[in-house]
Amino acid sequence: MPLEHRIDHRLRLVLTRAVGTLTDDEVFAYQHDVWSRPEVAGYDELIDMSAVEHVAVPSPDRIVRLASVSAGMDVGMPPTRLAIIAPRDFEFGLGRMYGAHREMDSRNTKRVGVFRSRAEAQAWLGLDGEPPLEV
């Protein structure tokens, strides 16, 4: 399973880890499957891209589409945050591109931050007092 996740209700956080080869179809499926659940409304999100070995390169249009679909799922939701851990340049760039397009969408309520380390991501989410969070 390229995208593994768990829901931490105590922290109000969805933790996700991408593993191996990642395709945009898997990312779209994850977005729909996880974020259409009412119990995660208003939760922050932490996505760890550290274990990704290959990204099946999506077209820029697919990144824009994913950002639009994601923002569309935010309608009526309180403001939340998404921290992406991306130690390598390629995944870091994709995360920044996704975040920029998502934040330009007027329906968006989720701030996106892209970080090189877990410690930076957890601090940005206000979870720096927690042990390293894992899926």
Q: What kind of region is each of these model predictions?
A:
Residues M1-V135:
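Amphipathic, Lys/Arg-enriched alpha-helical "gate/interface" segment within cytosolic domains
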